[in-house]
C-alpha cells in the first residue's frame, strides 16, 4: 500500500509537471524563442522524483508533442534531444548530497546548451543567411533556460513541491542523513554502539538497493533512523553495554520482561520520529525493520524456565507490520545479517557466508 502510494504520488507529480509545461508552451507568444521552454527543467524534476531513465523517455514524448503542435524546425528538436541526453547523464551522476549541487549541474547543462545550439547555428551559417541577432537571442534564451530556470528557480521551488505533495526528494533525504540532525546526534552520543550499527547497516542497504534497482538514498537514510527507539533504554541493547561499562542487565530480568523491553524499540522509535516530524516514509523503516520475527534468544530462555507447554511462540514475536517496500525489506535482511555477524567471534569469510545464507 505504501509503495503504491509513493508510485501514485510520483505519477501525479509527473502528470502535473507535464500539464504545466504544456500550458507554458501554449501561452508562449508567437515569434518568441522556443529555446526558453523549460524542457531541461522538466527532465531534471522528473529525474529527481523518479529516475533519469524515466525522465528521458517522458521528456522525449513531451518534446515530440510540443514540436508537432508548435511546428518547430528540426534543428530545435535535435537541440533539445541532445540537451536531454546531457541532462540525463549529468543527473544520473549526481549524488544528491546537497541542494547546491543542482547549480553545478545546471551550469554544465548551460554550457552544453550553448555548444549544441551554437554548433547547429555555426553549421547552418554555411548553408543559409541567418540574422546574428536571432542567434544571440536563442543563445541567451538557452542559457536562461538551462541555468536560471533549471538551476536557480528549480532550487527555490523544490522545497515547495516537497511540502505540497508530501514526498521526499533525494535532497530532502540527504539532509535527514546529516549527523547533526537531533536524533542522529543523540544516537551518536547516548547509544554509540547503536549508531555504529545503524551506519554499517545503512551502507549495506545502499549497496543492496543499487544492486536490485531500489532507491539507494531512501534505503540508506531509512536505515540510519531505524533503531532510534533504542534511545529510551540504550543499556538494554548489547551493542551499547561496553560504552556504559555495565554487565548485561537482562541477566536480572525474566525472559518475558526482556522480550517486552527489546520489542518496544520500534514503537518507541515511532514516538520519537513523530516528535521530530520525520516523514512517514522514514517511519516505515522504524516500524517494519523486524517485521513479525521471533525474539529467539528470550523465547528459548522462556522454554527452559517455563516449559514448552507454558510458552506461546507468538508472544515472543515483534508486532510488525512486515516490510511492504523493497527498501524496508532490504533493511530487515541487512539488520539481521549485521547483528548476527557482529555476534560471531572472529568469523571467517566462509562462516560469514553461512550466516548470510542462513
PLM regions and their residue ranges:
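Generic transmembrane alpha-helix motif of multi-pass integral membrane proteins
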Residues: 39-55, 63-66, 86-91
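Hydrophobic transmembrane alpha-helices
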Residues: 63-71, 105-130
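Membrane-proximal helical linkers
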Residues: 129-135, 139, 162-196
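Divalent metal-dependent catalytic cores for phosphoryl transfer on phosphate-bearing substrates
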Residues: 182-346
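Internal alpha-helical transmembrane segments of multi-pass membrane proteins
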Residues: 93-115, 135, 139, 143-144
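Alpha-helical membrane-embedded segments
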Residues: 113-116, 137-163
